[in-house]
Design a protein with these regions (language model features):
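Compact, glycine-rich, soluble single-domain proteins
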Residues: 1-81
Length: 81
């Protein structure tokens, strides 16, 4: 049986995929949901800058760039190792 764990998009490794389970509140988060990043959607981390730079994710056929603060507010369920 595969263990599932919840982490933020900021904590994901490049190329890792998961399912969005929660999106925190705050400035700009409603816009992120309107662009397709919402609970239940599958998301893949495409790239991220070392440190606190922007993070690119793929949701469906769309790529979104998230600021580091926004990426910390999106909880994703991923397969554990």
């Amino acid at each position: 049986m595969t263990e599932r764990k919840q982490i933020t998009i900021a904590q994901m490794e490049t190329g890792q995929s998961g399912r969005v389970v929660n999106i925190g509140s705050g400035r700009g988060m409603k816009r992120v949901e309107a662009m397709g990043l919402r609970p239940g959607k599958r998301v893949t981390k495409i790239s991220g800058m070392f440190g606190h730079g922007p993070i690119t994710v793929k949701v469906g056929g769309t790529q979104l760039a998230l600021g580091f603060g926004m990426a910390q507010k999106v909880m994703v369920e991923v397969a554990g190792k």
